[in-house]
């Protein structure tokens, strides 16, 4: 430890009595827990050890006090750490925020929190995502990692403490992660325990920390194709959840707090975490300022919550402007600053003006007044006369030029600056650009452009160091105008002729120079300073600081701007003083250099920041014999920072013994606009020092000054920054709204009126008026005088004795829920939480982002490379608690990023606005993140209370009274359609095939294509009939099957499947088509096959030889029981034998086939299709699409269920048209296949699935030109129909249409079908009738189960498209699912359907009896005299009568599908459709490939697939949380980031969210990161 005297060795510790060792261990534990401060720890520890240790050799009490402070990053230090660098805190403190008082306050607040501490769930992270920042990649601010022996001592201590039966800190072991060496997700993530009971549990945990876990990786459910390295998604698979089919419906209780997670044992890691999260969320929240927004009908009251009635209010009288002392008239003050230079340069040429230091801190060059004058003259002459031609000079007086000089070259800068003044051109000093894309560089470019700068002055050395292109030219910096670079070294300058003299006029309001200033948003503005203001500033400073000729000033500040420029470049020339400039680079290698310079030169004045005080304290033991007795002023220029007081105190206490006088410390406040706002005058020796203000943080947050009387932890101690400048006037105005004068006890923005401030923002008239021309008004609104004031951007008040106090900056103001917090205060609180080994102290940023109608606080810090996950998480949790305790404000997001990755300002600070921008655009790349939306977001609308519904009869009467029709619609009436088709006389499809085999034996019905687009198989009517006969014969002979037996057909998409289907019909068996298992992913796909075989009670399986081998393979045995398959018959080589007689069903109501499908909620359902339904279905499709023998259609979708199956296997046989079959998986090998086929055969009607459409849109998006060169033209397409059982994906359809419009695709061609389990084809666009219509509906209304139509572009609007036309013979009605009464036109309800091709019932629903028969035949509760039997589709939608004319000549009724009822999420009393939330999430970051949401115990879980690098995983967490909150008013509970392809998608392209949910809860996703939002 630093300054612990002699550290006992491990051996010595071992020799101590056991009770002392135990007490030591307990102390260590208390310190690590934050129960005692570092000071208290040291005290108790030395007391314990004193009887056992030899007398310590040095007792440096002051050193003890500053023990925790170590200097900032240095390359040199790392090589030779001196002993005082070894410090327990392991961190250089950013001394701006150093305050022992505050640190103790924070520790006390945390201790209070600890009594009620909750176990927060720690995020789960895949090993590869841990921050691996190479040690050499970052410059650690110190070298103080604790020594090895100390580490081992700590471990012993922890163990022995655990053995103590007095376990006060049981919760310290909670959440300790067992970090294994295995890379599997289980090992790398965290095991969370509940509260530990008793010692044994605790010990187990301690030892768990030292154990290595080896857990085998869980089976990979997701990698389905060996070709998954391609950009395509792995082969789509139907996955019912966790091996058995679950029905999870609204009826079953899904919200019990700790249900068994659907077959997942509750003690799974994920559920433990979620339980912890729920416990955390159950804590009472601080009541929001106004309980909630009220949800008036629809509208949220979109505003900040109302102010708290009990908040403190200002009570003082209105302040009066405060005047500074008059500016003295000194007869020999020059009429302009340039005149002063001329005077000293010609009369006192040998006097030193400026000394520059080399890297080691030694003086390297002294510029005399004579040299400054002569070189400035040469430069002025060169600029005006030598850059262009005589007739066309490049520069004229009044032009702006950029000054680009490094911070270690004050001499060249000074010559350039004064050269410009003498030439009457306007210098604009900027930082040296380091790379083409510096942080904030683009904004500097904007400034240069707006100032019209075409010329940059620089030194030869600097020019050589600028980044160059390959051919040696200076790179074009991002956003910069083209610049001509001029080198100002003496050898390149021309000597002016004897008769040439610069034009020096008395100072007026013409611009002298422009100083850049970065605003809170990151924009850079140029503050223009006039020659008069420059002169007046020098006069005011000279008077306030009592400057006299020949004094020496040590300047540690940036000499290019602010106080460093005014004191070190202007006031020194005015008063013929000598400035010694100490650059930042010297301070980094030798922190004491400025103190040494003061000592060596007997300097009277030093210009520093708190940082410099701190660094000097760190290094002061290097040099005992320095004296600061010569200093009459130590000007602390960031005295305006509220945290400067403790730096000044600490520095004084350390250096008073070195001659520093207490009255020499002079804090001042400055701003770019108002220049010096106030400065403490040098005091009289022995006079009492000014008092401090101890203010209540809570009062400050309401903008009032209250002496702190409450909890001392939440006090802010501020020192004054002296009095108003000579000749100036100051007032305090309200920070927002009109510039109204504040009351005396109110905090406001400091405004200054004087000639010494800036005059405008260059080229920005609008902003200038609001800042530089402010006329304050009284409370009644009348102006106070006519003198304009300048806003300083500083917040503060004028205290007793006209002393000025500053409590913050406008730029650092965070307005949260109507209260103001200062970013610096929050940084200070964060750093006061002992960061042990977690973060770098100087690298922390606090800003606010606007989310959901309020500002939210974000804290970002750089994490040390050696910080463990555990330490980081502990630190983060405690920072949250500390800020909550002290500032009474929640932190929305706390992020840690790898060392050295935050954007830097030129002097090494953090570029806040750039950091905020990176955060908002998702490119900050955090390595740890903690979001707390649950605590911060208190302005959500109240959850909806369901009102007692109006009865169905009243609804109907209400609709009639209002003149609204009931929401119903119908396709054409089948009875009226005259058909002279021979097909009508056949009732069964098998008969139609036989008839076709006789009537048109050679007519080809089917063509199957392969990936190359060549025909691999065709089937004419006769061929298909013969093949079916042979299969029927095999079923009888080999299978010994009887009529009515169920047969599973397991075939790849093709003609074999069709033949097997008709073979079953010929044999009287009931076919069940099933997607074959995927050879590369049997574990995921085979159980589904097995389940269908079991559920359908199949007597036999028909398949190919290849698949038969697969079903019986060893790999299959690992997934299912292969011994109990029913008979498996392969149909590759069939005997030439046929049945003596083909089966004919006795009635058309007999079962034709079973249609099995896994729904998106993971439920396997089989529906029964009768022969009459099959006939009616085929007839409706034939009529709608005008299908007959001479037509050809192309089909590219999966043939296993629903309408896809009907189109693939049934329709061609019924209508006689030719179907060109394209198996969708062939597209993975050849993306062009489908479109090329359509083009080759000039097909007019084609059917596909969303998967196919998405594949083509994504895969061919940038290949349209290739399609053109291949001669592909899609103008032949009349209808391109997507077969779906969901809400139409309008954006995908539009992308597809837009993309292929260039190759002839008609924008009217693309449409969609709609079907459900009860009726596979309800809507299909067809060839006639109006185009599908679209409407925009309000999302907020939809959540309330209402439809409100809005205009395009309305906020929160959703575009819905009609799902094609209702098929002939189909009637739909929209029904309230609860009352079962019909609803009115344009009202939301469940879609009920009546049609001859509705399925006749569920075959069996495995594991869910909630879907009873009433799904298929139910009646309206009211208003249907005909007592029609309806089938419930389970989908929400609405019918809207349009102005268009239908084929029947009546007005067209459009059906809009909103989504499946059993997929909806009920959250906060509202109904959400997952797809709406997913759409928002997918838009939020370019690296989100796919996304799915589900709920678990009322928490919203969002799973996103990351298609970028794993570094980006944590960027997604805040973006996802923000967008769901903004657009859906929901707080995300858990964000899971996974690899591409993890979200399971079925053959129809639908996400299987319930399967994903089960995998998540069973911890099978191997996530990259799981974030639990607090």
From Swiss-Prot:
Where composition is biased (Basic and acidic residues), the residues are 91-103
Biased-composition ranges, Polar residues, are 52-62
Q: Which residues form the signal peptide?
A: none
Under CDD domains, the record lists: Dip2 (cd05905)
Q: Which GO terms describe its biological process?
A: negative regulation of axon extension; nervous system development; positive regulation of peptidyl-lysine acetylation
* Gene that encodes it: Dip2b
User: What is known about what this protein does?
Assistant: Negatively regulates axonal outgrowth and is essential for normal synaptic transmission. Not required for regulation of axon polarity. Promotes acetylation of alpha-tubulin.
Q: Which organism is it from?
A: Mus musculus
Q: Which Pfam families match?
A: AMP-binding, AMP-dom_DIP2-like, DMAP_binding
Residues forming the DMAP1-binding domain are 12-130
Disrupted-gene phenotype:
Excessive axonal outgrowth and branching with decreased dendritic outgrowth. Reduced acetylation of alpha-tubulin.
Which protein is depicted? Disco-interacting protein 2 homolog B
